[in-house]
Regions:
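Vicinal oxygen chelate
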Residues: 10-14, 33, 62-106, 137-148
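Intrinsic, low-complexity N-terminal interaction/targeting segments
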Residues: 46-48, 84, 89, 106-112, ...
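Residue-level detector of conserved, well-ordered beta-strand and adjacent loop positions
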Residues: 39, 51, 101
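Eukaryotic phosphotyrosine signaling hubs
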Residues: 3, 57-61
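Conserved functional hotspot residues or short segments at active or partner-binding sites
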Residues: 54
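Beta-rich catalytic cores
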Residues: 2, 96, 129
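Surface-exposed beta-loop interaction hotspot
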Residues: 102, 108, 113-145, 149
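Core segments of cupin and vicinal oxygen chelate
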Residues: 2-45, 90-91, 135-163
């Protein structure tokens, strides 16, 4: 299972996308409707998306996995009783899978069958992929247990990093 992307909603999505291209070196991966996709030099179709919204929020954080990994995850989530629902991704790369809601409302999307793209010959400082995400939670212990016990990721105790 690999961390692929984070999907954000915010006002002035075009301006945010422009900033990420000019300042952080991400590449424009395209626009669908009011969603701007930005990619790195690796094989993921995008790393960050910005969707126009009047409010700021994280739409989801997405992971890609095999069908077997998705089946095992689906079984663990069902046994845990945590809110989850099936999803078919309409974002770049597609895929199908499961959205799991963590205790503080964070949405994690797990996709099988998502398509990769050709890597870009990037600049030396162009991002390749996301390496981590940080969640702020009112109950970090509860969120950490779900991430470890149900989702099968490692949470580092010193900074609570998901691996």
């Amino acid at each position: 299972m690999k961390l692929r992307s984070i999907e954000l909603a915010l006002p002035d999505a075009a301006k945010a996308a422009h900033f990420m291209v000019k300042t952080w070196g991400l590449a424009d991966a395209g626009v669908q409707g009011d969603t701007y996709y930005l990619r790195g030099s690796g094989t993921f179709p995008y790393l960050v998306s910005f969707t126009e919204s009047t409010d700021d929020f994280v739409r989801s954080t997405s992971f890609v996995c095999s069908d077997d990994e998705l089946a095992a995850l689906t079984t663990r989530v069902a046994a845990s009783g945590f809110p989850a629902r099936p999803v078919v991704s309409e974002d770049l790369g597609g895929g199908h899978g499961l959205i799991v809601e963590l205790p503080d409302g964070e949405l994690l999307r797990f996709l099988a069958g998502a398509q990769d793209v050709a890597s870009l010959p990037g600049k030396p400082d162009m991002p390749v992929k996301l390496t981590h995400v940080v969640f702020n939670a009112t109950d970090a212990e509860a969120s950490g247990h779900v991430v470890e016990d149900v989702l099968g990721h490692e949470v580092r105790a010193d900074r609570r990093d998901v691996r």
